[in-house]
Amino acid sequence: QCADANVVITPSDQFVLNEEAFQHNIEEGFRFVEHHQALLTIGITPTRPEPGYGYIQMGDAMEGATEVFRVKSFTEKPDRDFAKVFMESGEFLWNTGLIQANGHYLNSCFRQLFPDVMKRLDAVRPNFTLEDELEFVSENYPSYANLSIDRGVLERCDEVCVMHGNFGWADLGTWHAIYECRSRGEGDNVVVDSEVILDESHNNVIKLPKGRLGIVSGLDGYIVAEEDNVLLICKKGDSSALVRKYVN
């Protein structure tokens, strides 16, 4: 409703290690989008060749802004070899999925990319209230194209920039991130709500169904997880690629 607002869009499954640095980056981002007609996303320096994340290639630096660059390319979930090349090049950042923009530019992007969606919104906009939101979404959302905000908006807008964030970040949608973010117990294992007997096992992530007893012996750096009668046992670094290969 407020065209002059500056907006931040954030995924819900993210882990921020340094809240103060995160707040500083968001405030810097708001200052940038207030004076630039562009979408701004935030990227993080890769610490490993993670095939489960998206990557952003940095282009030219933006004048008058600290650690902000034009986006040269997006790559979604590359294989491990490409992820390693990206990390070693120094040109790529992990895509956090965080997006900032001013209301005017965001509105213009949506009108350019999704004219039918905006036409429906315009029809109800004068009297649209929060109480109407659920009804509107239930009636209209199923008919919209199945597009992620990355592919539907970020990769198609004319002006997209990336800020180099420094707040420490993990996407909790990967097993490796769960290992990094959860507290570790005996042998540096992360046992997630599971009953397990550990024998000479270290640096593993273990998640079993309630009522299932697991005995893990001689493993180092593995994922052992069961859900809906599917058992996954693999090295932590291979989990994202394997899940994508066999599940998707």
What name fits each language-model region?
Residues 59-93, 127-131:
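A short, charged helix-loop
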Residues 40, 49-52, 67-71, 82-83, ...:
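Glycine-rich, flexible loop/turn motifs
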Residues 1-61, 101, 108, 112-113:
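Conserved beta-loop-beta/alpha segment of the NTase-like Rossmann-fold superfamily
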Residues 3-5, 12, 35-39, 51, ...:
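Short coil/turn connectors at secondary-structure junctions
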Residues 41, 55, 73, 98-100, ...:
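Conserved hydrophobic/aromatic beta-strand scaffold that supports enzyme active sites
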Residues 90-103:
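Short loop-to-beta-strand entry elements in the cores of soluble alpha/beta enzymes
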Residues 104-248:
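Left-handed beta-helix
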